Amino acid sequence: MNPKSPLFLRLSDRLDVYLRLMRADKPIGTLLLLWPTYWALWLASDGIPDLAVLAAFTIGTFLMRSAGCVINDFADRDFDGAVERTKNRPFAQGRVKKKEALLLTAFLCLLAALCLIPLNHLTWLMSLPALFLALTYPFTKRFFPIPQLYLGLAFSFGIPMAFAAVAGNVLPQAWILFAANVLWTLAYDTVYAMADKEDDLKIGIKTSAVTFGRYDIAAVMLCHGGFTLLMAVLGAVIGAAWAYWTAIPIVLLLQYRQYAAIKSRVRQICFETFLANNRIGWVWFTAIFAHTFFAK
């Protein structure tokens, strides 16, 4: 195909728009979804996850995160133009139609559903509330005072699904990990919301940063503390090897550094602090990986 032909240029433009809607150039959301899923897969499989299951969850996570981003932009299409961070998104620039976004969301969900084929029926069943949470979260910002808590539920459903896929049932430690991840998500997404707080107050969007008001930093650190405490409880429940426990002082240091950073409440610093949570996910994955290795 001639790269200068009208058809090629049209297809290239549509592909660019769709990839931007999917946040394909911003993998942080996929990583923050993958870390707790990987924690669960490694714990449930004693450190040796089946490659087909691992691939299914990895690809499925990317696809569902992408679908969530598209439906999020659809839901926020009337607000994104008024927010500094989102004013250049496709809807805000008038580069995409509502029908296109809905069809792209449906297509991505269909592809994600195909990833369930090699998994058991319990995993299929648990994917239904996961799908519901992922697709409805963006609309909670209109009426729910802490939508980040709802997002925490959506971002944590990979955990019981992973246990269901590997063990055939959801063990108690899965729910401890689930609760821990809800708190972690609430912490880092509140920091994310702090970056947009002034804009959200003007347009009337509800976020945890708005709801917590001047106690937003205290709320973030309480959630971080609860997350780390529950990870310690998880370690006790599974009889974690010594390597697991080395994560706690490292994570506490990373959390303190986040506290020191967000005290300024500067928009860019809050956004960079949100991104830094990828390190916490990586540290805990390394600790769980080491636990499964040394516990054998």
Curated annotation (Swiss-Prot):
Catalytic activities: all-trans-octaprenyl diphosphate + 4-hydroxybenzoate = 4-hydroxy-3-(all-trans-octaprenyl)benzoate + diphosphate
Cofactor: Mg(2+)
Signal peptide residue numbers: none
A Gene Ontology BP annotation from the UniProt entry: ubiquinone biosynthetic process
InterPro entries listed in its UniProt record: HB_polyprenyltransferase-like (IPR006370), Prenyltransferase (IPR039653), UbiA_prenyltransferase (IPR000537), UbiA_prenylTrfase_CS (IPR030470), UbiA_sf (IPR044878)
EC category name: transferase
Protein name: 4-hydroxybenzoate octaprenyltransferase
Alphabetized UniProt keyword annotations: Cell inner membrane, Cell membrane, Magnesium, Membrane, Transferase, Transmembrane, Transmembrane helix, Ubiquinone biosynthesis
Pathway: Cofactor biosynthesis; ubiquinone biosynthesis
Keyword field contains Transferase: yes
Origin: domain of life: Bacteria
Subcellular location: Cell inner membrane
Molecular function (Gene Ontology), one example: 4-hydroxybenzoate polyprenyltransferase activity
Record's bilayer topology term: Multi-pass membrane protein
PANTHER family reported in the protein's UniProt record: 4-HYDROXYBENZOATE POLYPRENYLTRANSFERASE, MITOCHONDRIAL (PTHR11048:SF28), PRENYLTRANSFERASES (PTHR11048)
Record EC number: 2.5.1.39
UniProt similarity note: Belongs to the UbiA prenyltransferase family.
HAMAP family on file: UbiA
Function: Catalyzes the prenylation of para-hydroxybenzoate (PHB) with an all-trans polyprenyl group. Mediates the second step in the final reaction sequence of ubiquinone-8 (UQ-8) biosynthesis, which is the condensation of the polyisoprenoid side chain with PHB, generating the first membrane-bound Q intermediate 3-octaprenyl-4-hydroxybenzoate.
Keyword Lyase: no
